[in-house]
């Protein structure tokens, strides 16, 4: 701890200066108190060293009055002079501590102390006396730890107490109060309000240390307080009040921070008489009787109550002194029934000791006063009474009839010992806090001293700097004066020099005039020479211009000559190209003529053979069942017929190849012509632009021509690559066709039994187109994916065919047993040209009395592409004819199909029974022409007859076709059964007359001026269909007609297909009920569509317009999986 000697001399000067500033500029209400503090800190330190107790009352009264004046003034905000003031107070207070610690003089007796305490208590609050009788509890924790539970001594050792010495020094208490006020203001605690209210007012809700625990256990304003006071709520208060160092003077030297449970292990060990206090806790009461002690306590209480309204400051002190009662931990207290019996002299000692602590710790917060009043008054009653709620008169009455029981006095004394011990512990804690404050204040004082020293240093340095600045100013002023003098001298010299220079210039002006006159003469001569040279230069320039014009003329003539040469070269190239093209066209013409001749020969041969076969078939149909054929004889003929068919198919494929080669050559030549014409026009245009452009040179035109030729070369190379690819594709297809032919030949050899009667049942075969011949076959044409060119359309008009020879006579169909096989669909054609397809038109019948046979033909479709050529229509005719014998049923399908259209399925059920069954009708379809003025119509009618006497003659109808959308005509012939049936169809509904159980489904579609007929075996198995390709038009008509038959056969309606145009159906000839075994004769008129008039079909006897030869379909599915593609 610092003493007063350790303070630096500079600190007093700084403090005086700060106090003077505060007195001059601060608040006038605080100037008086600050002045008193300053006087006490500087020159009134003598009362602290006096040890007599005579002047204590006067100082105490004065200090209490000063404190009262200070308490009435609200605490201002903390300022720097106040901080210095606190340090000065602490420094003065520290001066008194060291002499008091070594001073062990005798204190007044108990009576003197009691009288002095009563005198000083006269200014206290009236109810403070009750604080001595609060029902305390014994510190059981300290007892179990071996520490003294009662800290007071016997009357013999009571003179060692230092409380009365503090009472003699009143201004010390005043300084401590001021110090506490400043410390509380520094730590943020509000100023104490002046105590003007009643002392026993109930606790306020906004009390500083009130919480849920304290309000529910201790601070109840009404009702009896509990016997065991739980003060846990006091632990939650703010920073502890910082007491001055005089609270426990004997502890100041030790200055140790102790654990919470060890506050009294070294309690005042520096005083010699305190060591034996622990042995005398349970001594008997001293010479003062219980009645006297009770009387003293009662008189003290009464005097305290009577002096209540006179000193609010004393009431603050009393309220603050009872605060440590609330700050002891609740674990150190016991119920009132567990009091330890102590002597009565301890209680008397507690009074004087408590006076000291009341006066030394008065600067506690004023809000605790109400708590102390409630806790003190509740201890004097029974546990079930609520003394805090009584009025002041009743409280005064409760103190007066206090009994003079020695046991009660002992219990009260013991309680006071407990309370004071707790208070002493709390004071010890606050003393430690004060030590920390003092250390901080010392640091602040040191800092202030440093600031003052720094200020003095600054004053010295500033004075030195001012002296230096003054010297420099004087020096600079002298320098400026010297420079002014030097400037004046320089001006004088400048004026002198100017005068001398003017004199020299005047002298040299005459020489200058002479020189100028000479220079003028030379200048005139030079001017004349310049004019001569300019005239010569103009002559040279004119000559140069003439020469340039001549050069330009010659260059232009040269460029024109070169352009003519280039133009002649280009024309020569073009003519050479034309010559080459003519040669190629001549070669193509020769090849075309040879192919046409060869094709005509083949077609003639085939037509002759087919006519013979047709005649034989008709003869066999007339004979019927009456003349059964010999199987063994027929097998050889069938094999021979199959061999002939294969040879014919090979010839037909060769003819197709020749034809398409010619087509390719023609198209290639035409394309070359078109490209050359376009190139010629572009070249002429470019040449014209170049010739008319004056700024373009020969090199630019040459570069443009070279670039154009390169582009043409690139395009030609690209076309060559395309042609090579197409040729390779054609070669691959030819090889594939050859393989198919070989496979078919092998199968035909392996299955002779199935084909023994095919020659008699084959109405038509795939042949090449017949040009304007008298007889022909049904045409089959397939339009390819690409758009046909105009040459192909013109070529289509030259091919005409006829069905007169084939269908002019009777058409006989004999029952031939065969195995049903699915009709293979034709694959889509991918080239840009139309070709003739070969399809096998074999008819297969099956042995055995089967009830129903269904022939399903899947649609064959190919995408129609090309804005020039319309969607090529085609006709698909599916005719199913079946004649029932005793043991066999025959299904015959005649189909005319084209690649881009759908081939519908035709179901032709036939009843198999012992009796003769009705015959199936044949389906006929006709195709109309598209909008490209290329029309083709084909009508085929076929019927199976059991009785030769009942022929059916259907009429083929070709419906008109719109210019854009194709039309399909469907004709369903009538078939006769055992019973007579007459059917009259209508053109609007396109129905047919069918015999007892016959159903004919016909699908007709249009193709671009191409039609074909395909005869396929009727099967019940489904046919695999290729990728679906939209067809331009399909038509299907089916109408089962009930007949008057004894044993009707089952009918099966096919799936309907939308018909774009109404079909005209005409059926002629009633059925003959009597004819059951003879063959049925079918007569079909021939058709010929005029290409010039597509809307009006024309009927002719032997001609039919068609385009391409027909293909022969293979007997197995493998024969139709691949077609000849371009």
From Swiss-Prot:
Short motif (PDZ-binding): ranges: 1123-1126
UniProt cross-link Glycyl lysine isopeptide (Lys-Gly) (interchain with G-Cter in SUMO2), position: 573-574
Organism: Mus musculus
Note: 'Motus' means 'motility' in Latin.
Record family assignment: Belongs to the angiomotin family.
Coiled coil start-end: 408-668, 700-730
Name of protein: Angiomotin
Post-translational modification: Polyubiquitinated by NEDD4, NEDD4L and ITCH, leading to proteasomal degradation.
Primary gene name: Amot
Skewed-composition ranges (Low complexity): 321-336, 1030-1049
